Amino acid sequence: MTKSIKRPPPFSCKQVLLTYVILAYTVAAHSSPPPCGLYGAPPCQFLPAPPGQTPTCARPGKTYCEHADNYPTYLIKSLVRKWGYEAATLLVDETWEDFAAVAWHDTPVFYDPKSIFPPRDPAAQDFNGYSYQTPFGGNPQRPSGGGNPLFVSNPSTEAPTYLLYTSSGGGHRSGHRYNSQGGGTSSSGGHLYINQSDKSTPYNATLWLKRLVRDLSRKQRQPDEVQAEVVEPVNEQTEEAEEQDNPAEDHPQSKRDVSLNMDLLDIVGVEAPNPLKKRSRTKRQSPGRSTLCQTTSQFITPQAALNSRGNWMFVVNEQNTARQMVKAELCASNTCSNLCELPNGYNSRCEQKFVQKRLIALQGNGQNLYTDTFWFPSCCVCTIAAN
């Protein structure tokens, strides 16, 4: 009796192909990045790259893409139209103007302290300036009583103010001095004492403005009169004789106009009445400027950018519907220029700095638009470090 031997059927091409496809899908499933959906949500379909990865449009070190692959233009247009009038007010381009070109560099105008510091409480008293200490260690008191604050009831003060003290040449003449006990004068010594009990000078807005306003009356005179007035000498002997005739007379307040204090006017920037007396100030700043790190500025309309949480998102930027243009400043080179020789063991390089800018972007699920902060290059800084 002969036994028949059963041979296994040969593998067909279809079976081999099916096995290959199954293996390929299995390997792809294990090597592909995990889906971006959380807690059973469907994978995100509107992202330039999965979380933790960089899209192919971004070069190494870049935080934005001007042209992103698979940019959802149609979806973004429909969502912008859904917003309606809000899109026109929320989507704003950055301007091309430079701050240095529009900044105001002139000397600020000096105003009355009352206009600079308005009263916080309407029912409270008006602001009469800060209570600074006098040059001799006292604290001036505020004037009491009502009336118009722009005018002083008593034109002469018992004790000189600090400004009058500086403009009167020290505040004393011929050895006279103020007595701190009786308020009188004595001829012994050269020191100045002020009665600081109740002899303080009240605030006067007229004198405040008079210090800083130039005297325009001399501008209207003839040039020869102004020159004669400046050249005319002062008879000092006659002035000393008049003071000796009245030794017991109290020391009067200096009648010199405080607006002629040239030190103060030079600080403010007011021109002198006589051009011959004008003092020229030499500028100490170097005329030219040089930068350590050269930069290139450009305005971009990014379609994808890296947000502050480290994820790449699609940014709303469609030329005809909605545009968000931002400024980027990139380092032109990696080495610092215009530097002196560095010590041994130190090197310098230009380092790119970034800032966060708030833009409107597309949500990962494509349902709506939202605002987010993205990183953009802002400046280039020269850093010196040890090797």
Curated annotation (Swiss-Prot):
What the entry lists under InterPro entries is as follows: Cystine-knot_cytokine (IPR029034), Spaetzle (IPR032104), Spz/Toll_ligand-like (IPR052444)
Identify the keywords attached in UniProt to this record, alphabetized: Disulfide bond, Glycoprotein, Signal
Q: What's an example Gene Ontology biological process for this entry?
A: negative regulation of neuron apoptotic process
Top-rank taxon of the source lineage equals Eukaryota
Glycosylated residues (UniProt): N195, N204
Residue ranges for the region (Disordered) are: 133-197, 219-256, 269-291
**Expression tissues:** Detected in the fan-shaped body which is a component of the locomotion center in the central nervous system (CNS) (at protein level).
Q: Tell me yes or no: is Cell division among this UniProt entry's keywords.
A: no
> Which residues does the propeptide include?
30-284
Q: Where is the composition biased (Acidic residues)?
A: 237-247
Q: Name one GO molecular function term.
A: Toll binding
SUPFAM superfamilies (alphabetical): Cystine-knot cytokines (SSF57501)
One Pfam family from the UniProt entry? Spaetzle
Q: How does it assemble?
A: Homodimer; disulfide-linked.
Q: What is this protein's name?
A: Protein spaetzle 5
Q: Which gene encodes it?
A: spz5
